[in-house]
Amino acid sequence: MALDILAMAPLYQAPAITRIGPKTDPSKRPADPLKPLVPSRTKLTTIEAKRIMSILDEAINKVELVTLLSYVASNREDVEGVLGEDIMRAVREHEEEAEEEGWLRDRLLSIELQKSSLSPLTQQIKDSTKNVLRLLLSNPQAARLLQMQTQSRSAEAQNFIDSLIELRGFLFEKLVTSPMEARDKAQFIQDINRQNSNNQQIIDTLENELAERMKKRNAEVEKENFVIQELKNHLHQVLKFSENSLLRTKQEAEKQQKADFRASQARVAKIQQEILQLQSQFYNLVMENREAEQALRKKKYKVETEIENWIQKYDTEMGEKQEELEDLEAVHKEEKIALEELKRRHKVLVEEFVQIREEREINSKKRMEAEQEMVRMVRAATLIQAFWKGYLVRSLLRSKKKRGKGKAKGKEKGKQKGKEKGKGKK
């Protein structure tokens, strides 16, 4: 049905600034403070409702495409490479048929004859529109690119699309509303109407009170206006009196001004005489000051000459001091270098001294150890000699025993000698 209506619409002639708004999404709508009027469901549950909404969405999509055919017809060069030859050929045929229909509609003569030729031409335009839609729907990319040219749609077409989107929102709300919610909504509206009638009665009562108070206020305003008028009259009299007083004051001021003018002329003459006297005094002071200035200039020149001589002397002395300072700095640098060399040598000597002292300590330790070792060796040699002597004595005694028995005295003497030798060894 929507396509039949748009098929009879003229092609687009001028760009519009309106733009298609997005389809109403029930799940993203802001919360309504009137909760009883808002459906509890946000999605369609029945197949019939989904089919109805899908048909309406498809119709809106097709309407959006059809309303942009006029833009394609007026901008062939811009969109020819995007839409393709088949779509452009169908658009040209549609444009020719639309122009022919417009020419027939513009003619005002022989209306009855034109009606007979207008009906088949209208049907041809419908068919061409459907053909262009079929080609665009078969090429989704071209359809998307064409839908991006929303600024090229006419204001009438945009209003029609907005109406369809609004119809879709109403239909969606109607389909998601259950019978129970519809009854609650009707009851809520009745309560609102009843409350509205009560509020209207209160408003009427308040309006009546307001009218009475306005009457009272108007009466008070009239009284205040009367008082204001009285005050204005009094003010007029005061102004008149003040004008007379001002005139008298002005006359007195003029008389005083004349008297002051005569007195001022006398003072001016006196002041002029004083000026002449002061000018003569000024001339005398200038002459005196010139002589003093010349003397001061001579003194200043002398002082400047002395200062210049002192500056030259100071520069000379400072140059000599600077040379001495440079010489001292050179000597200081040399001494500093020598000091660094001495520090380096001192560091080397300290390291050598530490090394020698460590070597001496090591040698002394070795010498002490050698002496201790020698003492131990001497003691060991002494012990070895003592044991060896004891061994020889014992071996001699054993040899004597083997030779035979000797005299008892001899044995006793031998034993005594052995005991003495053993004691001596010990």
From Swiss-Prot:
Residue ranges, compositional bias (Basic and acidic residues): 409-426
Predominant location of this chain? Answer: cytoplasm
Keyword Disulfide bond in record: no
* A GO cellular component entry from the record: ciliary basal body
Localization annotation:
Cytoplasm, Cytoskeleton, Flagellum axoneme
Q: Where is the composition biased (Basic residues)?
A: 399-408
User: Region labeled Disordered — which residues?
Assistant: 18-37, 399-426
Keywords tagged on the record: Cell projection, Cilium, Cytoplasm, Cytoskeleton, Flagellum
Alphabetized Gene3D superfamilies for the sequence: 1.20.5.190
Matching InterPro entries, A to Z?
A: DRC10 (IPR042815), IQ_motif_EF-hand-BS (IPR000048)
Q: Where is the IQ domain?
A: 377-406
Family, similarity comment: Belongs to the DRC10 family.
Function, in words: Component of the nexin-dynein regulatory complex (N-DRC), a key regulator of ciliary/flagellar motility which maintains the alignment and integrity of the distal axoneme and regulates microtubule sliding in motile axonemes.
Q: How is the quaternary structure described? A: Component of the nexin-dynein regulatory complex (N-DRC). Interacts with CFAP52.
Return the protein name: Dynein regulatory complex protein 10
Q: Which gene encodes it?
A: IQCD
